[in-house]
Swiss-Prot record:
It catalyses: O-phospho-L-seryl-[protein] + H2O = L-seryl-[protein] + phosphate; O-phospho-L-threonyl-[protein] + H2O = L-threonyl-[protein] + phosphate. This is Serine/threonine-protein phosphatase PP-X homolog 2. InterPro entries: Calcineurin-like_PHP_ApaH, Metallo-depent_PP-like, PPA2-like, Ser/Thr-sp_prot-phosphatase. It comes from the Eukaryota. Keywords: Hydrolase, Manganese, Metal-binding, Protein phosphatase. Binds 2 manganese ions per subunit. The keyword Transferase does not apply. Its EC number is 3.1.3.16. One of its GO terms (cellular component) is cytoplasm.
Length: 303
């Protein structure tokens, strides 16, 4: 068995990798991600997943429902870490799968794939607690800077973590951003990870303090200009697992069931067949006896 296959087995068992192995894995992942464009072209069939937020046992449930890699092609829309108790295992398993099956799993960046955010919402503290050093946090946050910003499925479905930006009109404009940096506090890269749709006209400031709120008219024009039939994003809790808006021109997919171990929501994944027919698969949280019961404080902010 190769090192990478051994690491996948170790992580699936909920065990931590050695720090030296984490460094090797992260370097391998950076080499692969470095060769990917800002906007990745993905071919259907593919299964799209929203926020995971360190809920490792629920990620295992997701794979039970959706199938294992590489039998199923996956596109994850970011926010792999923070809030949940097992961000380390969650992120490293997804990275290991990416290294082992680079064409079967696509990872794009969420607003929590950020040095600043992870220092507040759990990942930083978890790394320190599990490894008694910040090296693993540093290795992982370096990988964050290499993650793509968006994906397009079959030239028809635009996938992003958060939403749109008033500073761009075309997907091609995303392709020229310098993405290899910490998530900025403003600008296009920030907006892609922080913005939200709402029942408004045009654009509005966001209560999140980053990104914007945008309405149906903005989505209609963006989709028309770019030849897109659907915007698929994550970033907001959907109690029923997914939420369609604006005459089905935008969908929020949420893949962390019983978010923060207390919200009581179901989760979903969106399966697209080769003809882009959509199947929303719902799933609930893993049995509580299998989830980590480690007590820790999770900052109370629901983004």
């Amino acid at each position: 068995m190769s090192d990478i296959d051994q690491w996948i087995e170790t992580l699936k068992n909920g065990e931590n990798l050695k720090e030296t192995d984490v460094k090797i894995l992260c370097n391998k992942a950076k080499d692969i991600l470095n060769n990917e464009d800002n906007v990745i072209r993905v071919e259907a069939p593919v299964t799209i997943c929203g926020d995971i937020h360190g809920q490792f046992q629920d990620l295992m449930e997701l794979f039970k429902v959706g199938g294992d890699v590489p039998e199923t092609n996956y596109l994850f829309l970011g926010d792999f870490v923070d809030r949940g108790y097992n961000s380390v295992e969650t992120f490293l398993l997804l990275l290991a799968l990416k290294v082992r099956y680079p064409d079967q799993i696509t990872l794009i960046r969420g607003n929590h794939e950020s040095r600043q955010i992870t220092q507040v919402y759990g990942f930083y503290d978890e790394c320190l607690r599990k490894y008694s050093t910040l090296n693993v946090w540093k290795y992982c946050t370096e990988v964050f800077d290499y993650l793509a910003l968006a994906a397009v499925v079959n030239d028809s479905i635009f996938c992003v973590h958060g939403g749109l930006s008033p500073y761009i009109k075309t997907i091609d404009e995303i392709r020229i951003i310098n993405r290899k940096q910490e998530v900025p506090h403003e600008g296009v890269m920030c907006d892609l990870m922080w913005s939200d749709p709402d029942e408004i006209e045009g654009w509005s400031q966001s209560a999140r303090g980053a990104g914007f709120v945008f309405g149906a008219d903005v989505v209609k024009e963006f989709n028309r200009r770019n030849g897109i039939s659907l915007i698929c994003r994550a970033h907001q809790l959907a109690m029923e697992g997914f939420k369609l808006m604006f005459d089905n021109s935008l969908v929020t997919v949420w893949s962390a069931p019983n978010y923060c171990y207390r919200c009581g929501n179901v989760a979903s994944i969106l399966e697209l067949d080769e003809n882009l027919k959509k199947y929303y698969k719902l799933f609930e949280a893993a049995p509580t006896d299998r989830a980590s019961n480690s007590k820790k404080t999770i900052a109370d902010y629901f983004l």
